[in-house]
Amino acid sequence: MKEDAGNPLHLTSLNHVSVLCRSVDESMNFYQKVLGFIPIRRPESLNFEGAWLFGHGIGIHLLCAPEPEKLPKKTAINPKDNHISFQCESMGVVEKKLEEMGIDYVRALVEEGGIQVDQLFFHDPDGFMIEICNCDSLPVVPLVGEMARSCSRVKLHQMVQPQPQTQIHQVVYP
């Protein structure tokens, strides 16, 4: 196997994110009805309560916390906290649906070089943060080397011409 300095582990994609939860059923309901994931078969050899879901090219593995009462309580929505982010087709549609479902969210905005990225942040039932954005409009510019076209089209082995380096100058959080 030829060594690749830019990808030493020869990774190909993100497979799944595991999330500890108080109630597997409640979390499954959220990930299905709010984010559109579907339940998939989970190996029977896993001898603990959990569920696997799949959607948008990745898996979500829900793991029932052994001591649910010790999981951190939901806190204020903080866009700078750990989270997973999903690209969407229409921020307006997402915001309307969140309001219809009674889900509290925080809106944020990133502006860079005339490009505006809208972000919505909210929690799952256990306080794990979810971001929905239109981040695909923001180019992915490595600090060294070549530039990828955008978030959804990144292929490390097929990057395009080098671009001038820029940094995000302003991040506006409510």
Curated annotation (Swiss-Prot):
Disrupted gene: phenotype observed: General stress phenotype, characterized by compromised methylglyoxal (MG) scavenging, accumulation of reactive oxygen species (ROS), stomatal closure, and reduced fitness associated with reduced leaf area and dry weight, as well as prolonged flowering time. Increased susceptibility to the pathogenic fungus Plectospherella cucumerina which triggers mainly the jasmonate (JA)-mediated defense signaling pathway. Abnormal cross-talk between salicylic acid (SA) and jasmonic acid (JA) signaling pathways.
Location in the cell: Cell membrane; Cytoplasm
PROSITE patterns: VOC (PS51819)
Disulfide bonds: none
Active site: E131
The keyword Plastid is assigned to this record: no
Tissue specificity as recorded in UniProt: Mostly expressed in roots, and, to a lower extent, in leaves, flowers, seeds and siliques.
Domain VOC positions: 13-135
Annotated GO CC locations: cytoplasm; plasma membrane
Induction, as annotated: Accumulates in response to abiotic stresses such as cold, heat, drought, oxidative stress, genotoxic compounds, wounding, osmotic stress and UV-B. Slightly induced by salt (NaCl) and nickel ions Ni(2+). Strongly induced by methylglyoxal (MG).
Alphabetized GO MF terms: lyase activity
UniProt KW keywords: Cell membrane, Cytoplasm, Lyase, Membrane, Plant defense, Stress response
Pfam families noted in UniProt: Glyoxalase (PF00903)
GO biological process, one term: defense response
Function: Involved in the detoxification and scavenging of methylglyoxal (MG), a cytotoxic aldehyde produced in response to primary metabolism alteration observed during biotic and abiotic stresses. Modulates cross-talk between salicylic acid (SA) and jasmonic acid (JA) signaling pathways during defense responses to pathogens such as Botrytis cinerea.
Family designation: Belongs to the glyoxalase I family.
Protein name: Glyoxylase I 4
Annotated organism of origin: Arabidopsis thaliana
